[in-house]
């Protein structure tokens, strides 16, 4: 797996009035991208970490220091929806993708294991 640190702002518009997360607020997200597969006998890797970096780089540029609600497909950017959104953007370039985990604080987060590609 590889962990990326993202600074982003969001609001969760579908929450009831008075809920603090309905307001614009920020998080220092930790996004953990996990791949799974057989170990390549020659390299000793399941996947080179640089491949994960390359696949995630365009997404990182979109979401780091961004207001997530303004991104296409993220009008309600809960951590769960952000996981699904990232999965959809990564699965074609990372067919061994197994799991996306997002921590929004040290004690809260979510894990998404979407459909396996193919």
Task: Map each language-model feature to its residues.
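Charge-rich, low-complexity N-terminal segments
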Residues: 1-118
């Amino acid at each position: 797996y590889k962990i990326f640190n993202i600074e982003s702002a969001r609001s969760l518009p579908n929450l009831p009035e008075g809920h603090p997360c309905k307001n614009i607020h920020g998080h220092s997200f930790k996004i953990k991208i996990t791949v799974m597969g057989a170990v390549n006998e020659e390299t000793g890797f399941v996947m080179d970490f640089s491949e994960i970096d390359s696949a995630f780089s365009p997404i990182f540029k979109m979401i780091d220091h961004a207001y997530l609600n303004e991104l296409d497909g993220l009008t309600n950017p809960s951590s769960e929806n952000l996981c699904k959104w990232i999965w959809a953007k990564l699965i074609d370039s990372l067919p061994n993708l197994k799991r996306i985990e997002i921590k929004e604080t040290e004690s809260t987060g979510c894990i998404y294991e979407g459909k396996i590609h193919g």
